[in-house]
């Protein structure tokens, strides 16, 4: 219902919204076309696809959940060139491919749920609804919702600020953000994989194993991210050229990518620490870290760095934020974990 209302409001106020976000007369038509297909028409299928996938994974059906996500992603990759180049739909083709792929994922998950009818606790029947768990769901999910909302707000701010330098920086940043998102999505996959392990061991009081799982995940994310950084730094220009052959945008984007990728390892670890706290049921602590990182630091620093340094200052902002937040995140985790250990020792003595 929330997604439906958001999609409707986005459609009604699409013109002032796109103008506020920095769409120029040259790019307004493309932006509006993408917005209508992906957000207005594709918003509900996108949200349903994500929700059904996470519900499957939460019940231990990780393989079909991953298959559903992969199905939508692979279908999107196949449809993109067909619609963009084959049917000459340009930006609208990419948007249609994304919307249709998410709808196909929803159909896939519905079929899976029908097949798992006797092995799943998920039901849409109203008689099973209860307010008993609403508070717990919101408590744990608040940090993720806050991270997504503030992350989108940060992107809106940087697109708005970069639009003051022309369409080329906006295009270059948009491509860099997509490339930069790939290693972060790998980290998100790690998060979804290790959260049940952390949660189960934390609930069982097996803190030694919980810490081992957490630190292993953090180290893995750090090593994988470092490999991506090396790749992006060494091959920034050809990577950008794959997305856009236009020389000026490609060159500017390569410079952006070499800077932006430096923040990826620290961002990955900060993400994992926040999700570790969520898995421990510490939604408040996780939300504090998220708000501090995106709200208190990122957005104000974007504006400040743009004022003091200019266009490149905004690109350096993410690295600065992650450097500041890493010791804060780690300190929050250690404080929370040590508090729980002390509490348990006291209970054992009693």
Region locations from a protein language model:
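Short alpha-helical transmembrane segments in multi-pass integral membrane proteins
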Residues: 1-42, 86-142, 198-263, 305-350
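Residue-level hotspots within pore-lining transmembrane alpha-helices
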Residues: 5, 9, 40, 44-45, ...
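Short runs within selected transmembrane alpha-helices of multi-pass transporters and secretion channels
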Residues: 38-57, 65-76, 94-109, 191, ...
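Hydrophobic/aromatic end-of-helix segments at the C-terminal termini of transmembrane alpha-helices
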Residues: 14-17, 79, 153-166, 194, ...
């Amino acid at each position: 219902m929330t997604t439906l209302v958001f999609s409707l409001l986005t459609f009604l106020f699409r013109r002032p919204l796109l103008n506020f976000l920095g769409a120029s007369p040259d790019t307004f038509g493309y932006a509006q076309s993408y917005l209508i297909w992906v957000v207005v028409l594709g918003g509900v299928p996108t949200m349903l696809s994500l929700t059904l996938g996470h519900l499957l994974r939460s019940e231990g059906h990780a393989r079909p959940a991953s298959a559903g996500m992969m199905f939508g992603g692979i279908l999107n990759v196949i449809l993109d060139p067909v619609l963009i180049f084959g049917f000459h739909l340009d930006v609208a083709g990419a948007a249609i491919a994304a919307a249709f792929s998410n709808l196909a994922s929803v159909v896939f998950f519905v079929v899976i749920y029908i097949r798992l009818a006797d092995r799943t606790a998920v039901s849409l029947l109203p008689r099973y609804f209860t307010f008993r768990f609403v508070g717990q769901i919101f408590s744990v999910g608040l940090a993720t919702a806050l991270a997504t909302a503030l992350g989108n707000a940060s992107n809106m701010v940087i697109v708005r600020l970069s639009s003051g330098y022309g369409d080329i920086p906006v295009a270059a940043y948009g491509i860099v953000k997509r490339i930069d998102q790939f290693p972060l999505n790998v980290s998100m996959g790690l998060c979804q994989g290790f959260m049940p392990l952390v949660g189960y061991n934390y609930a069982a009081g097996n803190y030694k194993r919980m810490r081992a799982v957490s630190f292993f995940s953090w180290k893995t994310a750090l090593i994988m991210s470092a490999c991506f950084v090396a790749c992006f730094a060494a091959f920034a220009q050809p990577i950008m050229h794959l997305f856009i052959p236009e020389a000026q945008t490609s060159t500017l984007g390569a410079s952006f990518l070499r800077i932006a990728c430096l923040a990826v390892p620290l961002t990955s670890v900060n993400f994992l620490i926040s999700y570790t706290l969520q898995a421990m049921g510490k939604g408040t602590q996780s939300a504090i870290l998220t708000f501090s990182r995106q709200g208190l630091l990122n957005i104000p620093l974007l504006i400040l760095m743009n004022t003091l340094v200019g266009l490149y200052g905004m690109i350096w902002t993410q690295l600065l934020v992650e450097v500041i937040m890493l010791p804060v995140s780690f300190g929050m985790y250690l404080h929370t974990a040590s508090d729980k250990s002390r509490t348990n020792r006291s209970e054992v003595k009693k």
